């Protein structure tokens, strides 16, 4: 009897330091000693298939770390029916060699210990120790399971359609391996002789929070919920998929996307049947109606792929009618630009010389810079350098050694306008050197000020602000309107038939260098300072007019739609062949929507491929979008007749500054509309903080 409960090798294994982190329950109770010694305090610990009892020192509540137990009770040799309470605060543990009598200190601890003890004995009764084998056999089996269910088990949280079937197959293998390993591991972990070293390490991981079962559950939840989200989203939006999609590439993308959704449905049901555990009931297959709908739309779009031709701009006009040797058609545009002059926009110019204290003050109104230039001419001064506070863009040739730099700073919030200039009569420091300070209070907070020449905002003909502020009459100035100036606009654009490119040639203004710069050159440079950076070229490729930094315009002969990858805002027109007109379709923004609402639908290729190309593509779109509110501009309709494009004046719509776009030869009417809308596109981009300088700074 003493031999069976005090084997030296086991006592060494049960040093308190080795088992204290692996104890199910522990308590100080009194054990009946042999040879009539009565009840003695012992520290009882329930450790896997053993009860260990330690001798305590005086006033000690726990054994020392290096202390071996006084003895142990192998629960695999105990009878659960005879292990029971025999008297108040007293119970017995029935072992095949001996009955242990234990007295608890309180009723609660006794019942808790006895409940755990009996449950452990009954669980151990079900284990066939011979089937498990020896320690070497157990270690070999654990290593085989570890080859499949590796530690750590890395599983994806997103699975692309191309990998969906492979993922389901892999999860089936994981589940099959887990179903074999789980009962074996649960038996091994109850046997203290087996559960040590690398076996214990693997078992602890297997049943822990990072183990295979919980890892597979987390993977299942994220992957399947992502599939369900895409299936439901596609089902709700499928009727709108052909809106603004008219090209072969569009229909190909839609067909591929719908096939991917049917793959998701098949793989989802396959997973639910073979990998989910149910109580004798197979799950009902889901999304069968959606799958049938997807198949019907696939059959609808596949013929369109075959019938669509590769879109070329040549199909929209007769190329043979262009007789120009270089294939370039010059397009003339004309109109009137109106400028507001506000009471607050008054400049005081003070000129002070270094040799005398003479002060000259000139007053002119802004933003009419010509008055300022005439004032400067009276003082025989020239503007040498011009810097904008935002762009820091130099707009002049390098100054000569006899010129001092002019400093120009615009701070829109404080409305300060400061300029310092120098004299062109500087002779070795002996002549008078006047310094000029200009202070101006004018409003630069409106994006239209930054997008219009000469620091001015256009005067709306009706009640709509050009950038969509929705305010009319007063413009963007800080004070009341005192005058409205008008300036004729005459610009030229070119259409290159060979490259299908629309472009605006560089302005000849501002190319004269030196001190004899004209008023027009200075104002032109100032205009470029505020509007510069836009690439004034549109190239038609694969159904789109594409610009370097102004977005793209889809055109298929019927629908004209401008979009930009960093905003959901769009400008849409539809061609009405009966009226020979382009009719504007007002943009409908969601309530509270901002520019970052979604990826533009015209970017259909990117949008659909985001769910088909790779595993990471099923995650949320990484495309950065602007968070500014959308413009509310109501754009005019345009009529096309005899190669002329003119706006149709409608009450409530904005009246454009370009009132005539004239082509001497027949070219695609969409080219003329693109020219007419370029300024509006620039205004919208600046309003959305997507102007070229903003983008380049980011």
From Swiss-Prot:
It comes from the Eukaryota. GO terms for molecular function: enzyme activator activity; phosphatidylinositol-3,4,5-trisphosphate binding; phosphatidylinositol-3,4-bisphosphate binding; phospholipid binding; protein kinase regulator activity. SUPFAM superfamilies: PH domain-like. Disruption phenotype: dagA and piaA double mutants require both proteins for reconstitution and activation of adenylyl cyclase. The keyword Manganese does not apply. Pfam families: PH. Residues 22-122 form the PH domain. Residues 594-630 are annotated as: Disordered. One of its GO terms (cellular component) is phagocytic cup. Residues 601-626 have a biased composition (Low complexity). Signal peptide: none annotated. Gene3D superfamilies: Pleckstrin-homology domain (PH domain)/Phosphotyrosine-binding domain (PTB). GO terms for biological process: adenylate cyclase-modulating G protein-coupled receptor signaling pathway; aggregation involved in sorocarp development; chemotaxis; MAPK cascade; phosphatidylinositol-mediated signaling; regulation of actin polymerization or depolymerization; regulation of adenylate cyclase-activating G protein-coupled receptor signaling pathway; sorocarp development. The keyword Secreted does not apply. InterPro entries: PH-like_dom_sf (IPR011993), PH_domain (IPR001849), PI-Interact_SigTrans_Reg (IPR051707). Keywords: Cytoplasm, Developmental protein. Disulfide bonds: none annotated. It is found in: Cytoplasm. Couples activated G protein to adenylyl cyclase signal transduction from surface cAMP receptor. Pianissimo a cytosolic regulator and CRAC, are both essential for activation of the enzyme adenylyl cyclase. Pianissimo and CRAC do not function redundantly. Both proteins are integral components of the adenylyl cyclase activation pathway. This is Protein CRAC. It comes from Dictyostelium discoideum (Social amoeba). The lineage of its organism: Eukaryota, Amoebozoa, Evosea, Eumycetozoa, Dictyostelia.
